[in-house]
From Swiss-Prot:
<feature type="compositionally biased region" description="Polar residues">
    <location>
        <begin position="188"/>
        <end position="202"/>
    </location>
</feature>
<comment type="function">
    <text>Non-SNARE longin protein involved in membrane-trafficking machinery.</text>
</comment>
<dbReference type="InterPro" id="IPR044783">
    <property type="entry name" value="PHYL"/>
</dbReference>
<keyword id="KW-0472">Membrane</keyword>
<keyword id="KW-0813">Transport</keyword>
<protein>
    <recommendedName>
        <fullName>Phytolongin Phyl1.2</fullName>
    </recommendedName>
</protein>
<feature type="domain" description="Longin">
    <location>
        <begin position="12"/>
        <end position="115"/>
    </location>
</feature>
<feature type="transmembrane region" description="Helical; Anchor for type IV membrane protein">
    <location>
        <begin position="227"/>
        <end position="247"/>
    </location>
</feature>
<dbReference type="InterPro" id="IPR010908">
    <property type="entry name" value="Longin_dom"/>
</dbReference>
<dbReference type="GO" id="GO:0016020">
    <property type="term" value="C:membrane"/>
</dbReference>
<keyword id="KW-0653">Protein transport</keyword>
<dbReference type="GO" id="GO:0015031">
    <property type="term" value="P:protein transport"/>
</dbReference>
<feature type="compositionally biased region" description="Basic and acidic residues">
    <location>
        <begin position="170"/>
        <end position="187"/>
    </location>
</feature>
<keyword id="KW-0812">Transmembrane</keyword>
<feature type="region of interest" description="Disordered">
    <location>
        <begin position="151"/>
        <end position="216"/>
    </location>
</feature>
<dbReference type="InterPro" id="IPR011012">
    <property type="entry name" value="Longin-like_dom_sf"/>
</dbReference>
<comment type="similarity">
    <text>Belongs to the synaptobrevin family.</text>
</comment>
C-alpha cells in the first residue's frame, strides 16, 4: 500500500443496514466505522446516488439492486469520479462473486471471498485519474454544487442558524405569495364588479325604452277612444235634437 495515499478512508457494501463487506484504510478505524454506521442509518431514500461534503470529507452513496455502496473520501475528488469509483466497485464485486461461484450468480453477492486487492486497485486507479485530470471547468463544478445543494439531506446534522435562516426565508416567500394571490384576487373581483355593473346598465336602458314605448301606445289608445266616444255622443245629441224638432218635444209620445 505504499503508493496508496489516505484519500479514500473507507468504503463498504451494505444491505438492510448490515455491512456485508468493508475496506478500512490504515487510519482511524473506529472513527471511520462509526461515521459509516451513522451515515448508512440515514441513507437518503428515493435516490440512485447521493453525495455530501462535511469537514473536508465527501460521503458518497450508490443505491443499486437493494445494495448500498458507500465511501468516505477526501473532498479533493470530483463527485463524478467518486460515483465512477462506486460503480466500478459494484461491477468488480459482482464479477468476483461470479468467478467464486463458478458462474452460478443467483442475485445475492457473497462478499466473504472478495479480496482487498480489488478495492486497492480501484483506489489506485481513482488516485491516478485525479492526478492526471486537468482543472475542472466552472460549468461542471457549478453543476455538481447545484446538485449537492438541491438534493441535500442532513446526514450528520445541520446547524440551527441555517435552519432558522431557511425557515425565515421560506416564511417570507410564502408571505409574498399570499400577498400576491390576495392582490390578484382583488383585481379579479374589481374586474368582475365592473363587468357586472356595465352589463346591468346596458340592460337597464332597453327596459326603460320598452316601458316608455308601451306608455305612449297606451296614451294614443286612450286618446283615440275619447275621440270615438265624443263623436258618438255628438251624433246621439244631433239625432235627439232632430227627433225633438219633428215631434215638437214629447207630443209624439202622448199619442
Amino acid at each position: 500500500m505504499g503508493s496508496i495515499q489516505n484519500t479514500v478512508h473507507y468504503c463498504c457494501v451494505s444491505r438492510d443496514n448490515q455491512i456485508m463487506y468493508a475496506y478500512n484504510n490504515a487510519g482511524d478505524h473506529r472513527n471511520n466505522e462509526s461515521l459509516a454506521a451513522l451515515c448508512l442509518e440515514k441513507t437518503p431514500p428515493f435516490h440512485k446516488w447521493y453525495f455530501e461534503t462535511r469537514g473536508k470529507k465527501t460521503f458518497g452513496f450508490l443505491m443499486k439492486d437493494d445494495f448500498v455502496y458507500f465511501a468516505i473520501v477526501d473532498d479533493v475528488f470530483k463527485k463524478s469520479s467518486v460515483l465512477d469509483f462506486l460503480e466500478k466497485l459494484r461491477d468488480e464485486l459482482k464479477e468476483a462473486n461470479k468467478k467464486n461461484s463458478r458462474g452460478s450468480f443467483s442475485g445475492s453477492i457473497s462478499f466473504s471471498n472478495v479480496q482487498d486487492q480489488i478495492v486497492r486497485r480501484l483506489i489506485a486507479s481513482l488516485e491516478f485519474d485525479h492526478t492526471c485530470l486537468p482543472l475542472s471547468s466552472p460549468s461542471i463544478d457549478g453543476a455538481e454544487q447545484s446538485y449537492a445543494s438541491n438534493s441535500k439531506a442532513p446526514l450528520l446534522g445541520r446547524s440551527n442558524k441555517q435552519d432558522k435562516k431557511k425557515g425565515r426565508d421560506h416564511a417570507h416567500s410564502l408571505r409574498g405569495i399570499e400577498i400576491e394571490e390576495h392582490r390578484k384576487s382583488n383585481d379579479r373581483g374589481n374586474v368582475t364588479e365592473c363587468s357586472n355593473a356595465s352589463s346591468e346598465s346596458a340592460t337597464y336602458v332597453p327596459r326603460r325604452g320598452r316601458s316608455g314605448g308601451s306608455q305612449s301606445i297606451e296614451r294614443k289608445w286612450r286618446r283615440q277612444v275619447k275621440i270615438v266616444l265624443a263623436i258618438d255622443i255628438a251624433i246621439c245629441l244631433t239625432l235627439l235634437g232632430v227627433w225633438l224638432a219633428i215631434c215638437h218635444g214629447i207630443e209624439c209620445t202622448r199619442s
